């Protein structure tokens, strides 16, 4: 059993400082944090030349509406006032925005959801000290938005549960129509943000169903909230994707409208489509991803004391139903972190005081690894060489987000594709190709612009050093996908082809 003795306010304030430190760090966790956010919006609003992913092209499988609601005001503000900001500065501001939103909404929901001060302090403290909150939640993932939508939805559902289980007749008679309307709104927003959002709500949704079965009229408010929001989001997407003329011509033809979640569902329902993004064993979320999220916190989570609570049921719901889908990435589970922290139990007799320190060590290590080092040189390198016309050959890095260049004349190609030399900057994304293929590409590039090879310093040994001149390097970069324990030197280098 652990008795937590600390000045929690001091720790809490310290985590706020760390949150902003990691928000302004340059790590790059997954391509989707760029390619499903500002890579798309800066092209549409600021006219940047970017690499638009397939999800936002023909038959779009991603909704633009949530992105415009979250990041649109910032970008339109910059455009309207003609602010002379670099793309890197815009990135920092957008991340600060999501960081502050996360901080306010998460703490608010946990405070009002939990029944006592010790429970509130526990949940907020462990949520705030987790590397998921300090790092992942401050990146521009759709999962970061999903966390906030889920917390508010669960707060509303838990309130409905409280009304039903209260022994106070006055509480039972409270009108919760607004609550149900907002729940419908949030479910719709959650689905348009990520199609898997309902997976988190299947088990806690039982309390909504119980309430509606006793209050039939209230069910209409839930339906109205959901369908009115859905109709609005479909209309917004239809306008943004340029299909409004089809709607005017054929308003009763469903195919005239852009229904992004439906397109996403149809795409992901095909196994061969999921296989392009990676197939994982069905146990990956439960045995790999959740332990990686909680770390030593998994010890505190295994308890019978909280199994009937709404946060615990939400965690189990998300774990079970997302595990049915064979494509399983860690970030899909990050909305569960705050709710799992609500269910930590320190009253267990076998839990020892030293176990608490393993939580600190684990989260400090993971925060530095994922918040500073992981692919940490990609964005700084793009920012460093953005002002020079060039051909950039990237190897063994994540796909460089071209919007960081802040240019309206950029093109991204892959191995074997022809370069358009009229562009100011050409990016050749070689991903993890064989080094011989990269060498061949370097030999065949015909241009008057300087040609740069950008690769982890540890990987440069695959090339003839005499053919290159080192230009610049960024130390805080670690490539976990191509680790060579014989040479684990960190850093991302820029080498000019001679």
Curated annotation (Swiss-Prot):
InterPro entries: GPI_mannosylTrfase (IPR005599). Pathway: Glycolipid biosynthesis; glycosylphosphatidylinositol-anchor biosynthesis. Keywords: Endoplasmic reticulum, Glycoprotein, Glycosyltransferase, GPI-anchor biosynthesis, Membrane, Transferase, Transmembrane, Transmembrane helix. It comes from Candida albicans (strain SC5314 / ATCC MYA-2876). GO terms for biological process: fungal-type cell wall biogenesis; GPI anchor biosynthetic process. It is an enzyme of class 2 (transferase). One of its GO terms (molecular function) is alpha-1,2-mannosyltransferase activity. It is a multi-pass membrane protein. GO terms for cellular component: endoplasmic reticulum membrane. May be used as a target for the development of some new fungicide, due the fact the presence of a fourth mannose in GPI-anchor proteins is essential for viability in fungi but not in mammals. It is found in: Endoplasmic reticulum membrane. Its main location: endoplasmic reticulum. Belongs to the glycosyltransferase 22 family. PIGZ subfamily. Alpha-1,2-mannosyltransferase involved in glycosylphosphatidylinositol-anchor biosynthesis. Transfers a fourth mannose to trimannosyl-GPIs during GPI precursor assembly. The presence of a fourth mannose in GPI is essential in fungi. Pfam families: Glyco_transf_22 (PF03901). Its EC number is 2.4.1.-. This is GPI mannosyltransferase 4. Glycans are attached at residues 47, 84, 408, 473. The chain crosses the membrane at residues 11-31, 63-83, 96-116, 140-160, 189-209, 222-242, 247-267, 282-302, 310-330, 332-348, 350-370.
């Amino acid at each position: 059993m652990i008795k937590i003795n600390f000045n929690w306010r001091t720790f809490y304030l310290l985590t706020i400082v760390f949150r902003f430190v990691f928000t302004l760090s340059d790590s790059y966790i997954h391509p989707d944090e760029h390619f499903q956010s500002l890579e798309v919006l800066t092209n549409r609003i600021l006219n940047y030349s970017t690499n638009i992913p397939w999800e936002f092209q023909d038959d779009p499988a991603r909704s633009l509406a949530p992105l415009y609601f979250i990041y649109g005001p910032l970008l339109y503000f910059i455009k309207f006032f003609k602010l002379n900001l670099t793309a890197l500065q815009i990135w920092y501001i957008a991340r600060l925005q999501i960081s502050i939103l996360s901080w306010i909404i998460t703490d608010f929901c946990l405070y009002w959801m939990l029944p006592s001060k010790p429970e509130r302090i526990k949940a907020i403290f462990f949520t705030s000290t987790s590397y998921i909150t300090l790092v992942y939640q401050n990146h521009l993932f759709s999962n970061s938005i999903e966390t906030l939508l889920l917390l508010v939805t669960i707060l509303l559902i838990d309130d409905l549960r409280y009304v039903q289980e209260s022994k106070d007749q006055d509480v039972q008679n409270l009108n919760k129509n607004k609550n149900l309307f907002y729940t419908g709104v949030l479910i719709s927003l959650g689905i348009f943000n990520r199609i898997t959002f309902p997976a988190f709500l299947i088990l806690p949704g039982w309390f909504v169903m119980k309430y509606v079965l006793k209050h039939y009229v209230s069910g209409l408010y839930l339906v109205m909230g959901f369908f009115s929001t859905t109709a609005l989001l479909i209309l917004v997407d239809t306008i943004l994707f340029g299909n409004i003329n089809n709607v005017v011509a054929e308003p009763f033809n469903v195919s005239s409208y852009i229904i992004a979640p439906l397109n996403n569902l149809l795409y992901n329902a095909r196994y061969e489509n999921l296989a392009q993004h990676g197939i994982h064993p069905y146990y990956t979320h439960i045995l790999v991803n959740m332990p990686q999220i909680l770390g030593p916190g998994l010890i505190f989570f295994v308890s019978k004391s909280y199994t009937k609570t709404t946060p615990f049921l939400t965690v189990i719901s998300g774990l079970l139903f997302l595990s049915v889908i064979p494509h399983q990435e860690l970030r899909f589970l990050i909305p569960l972190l705050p709710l799992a922290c609500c269910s930590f139990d320190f009253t267990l007799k076998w839990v020892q005081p030293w176990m608490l320190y393993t939580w600190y060590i684990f989260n400090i290590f993971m925060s530095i690894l994922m918040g500073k080092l992981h692919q940490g040189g990609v964005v700084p390198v793009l920012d460093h060489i953005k002002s020079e016309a060039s051909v950039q050959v990237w190897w063994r890095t994540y796909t460089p987000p071209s919007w960081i260049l802040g240019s309206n004349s950029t093109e991204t190609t892959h191995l074997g594709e022809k370069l358009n030399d009229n562009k100011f900057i050409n990016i050749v994304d070689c991903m993890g190709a064989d080094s011989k293929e990269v060498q061949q590409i370097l030999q065949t590039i015909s241009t008057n612009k300087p040609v740069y090879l950008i690769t982890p310093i540890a990987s440069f040994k695959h090339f003839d050093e005499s053919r290159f001149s080192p230009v610049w390097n960024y130390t805080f970069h670690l490539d976990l996908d191509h680790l060579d324990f014989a040479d684990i030197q960190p850093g991302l280098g820029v080498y000019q082809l001679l």
